[in-house]
């Protein structure tokens, strides 16, 4: 139920397992094993690893968000909780982590907004409504992609200035 930060620079097979684990979304992908330990997407426990970046002593932090300013996650409904409990009955800590993810995310966003306001971090986020994870409409996807492209061109100079201060 806790986030771990794995790395690998020698064993390509282990690296692939880590990549598989990092993209193992609940109910959509199987639990992945790395070194005999079951893992799922670390974003469940640490959606935006801002505290980790600060603990590591990074003095320049760039946060790329996928949601609009002011977005907050809502708590999952009871039926969803029951579904997770059934699917992951062997992993009660995972279920607990999934069900409290919104509170952790919202706390992280509060910290990010504070640090951004203080000029301590650089944040890039969409300014238009996002597309859903399951979006298939090419025009909507293209529109959102182009927004990101234009936004980055607009923010690029500010990013360079932040990184070079």
Give the role of each language-model region.
Residues 1-165:
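Patatin-like phospholipase
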């Amino acid at each position: 139920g806790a986030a771990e930060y794995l790395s690998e620079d020698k064993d390509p097979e282990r690296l692939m397992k880590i990549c598989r684990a990092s993209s193992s979304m609940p109910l959509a992908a199987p639990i992945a094993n790395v070194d005999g330990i079951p893992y799922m997407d670390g974003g469940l426990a640490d959606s935006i690893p801002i505290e980790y970046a600060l603990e590591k002593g990074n003095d320049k932090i760039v946060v790329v968000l996928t949601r609009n300013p002011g977005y907050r996650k809502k708590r999952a409904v009871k039926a969803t909780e029951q579904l997770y409990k059934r699917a992951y009955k062997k992993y009660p800590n995972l279920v607990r982590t999934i069900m409290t993810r919104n509170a952790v995310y919202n706390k992280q966003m509060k910290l990010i907004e504070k640090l951004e306001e203080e000029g301590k971090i650089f944040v890039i986020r969409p300014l238009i409504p996002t597309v859903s994870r399951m979006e298939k409409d090419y025009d909507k996807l293209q529109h959102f992609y182009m927004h990101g492209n234009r936004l980055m061109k607009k923010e690029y100079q500010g990013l360079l200035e932040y990184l070079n201060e």
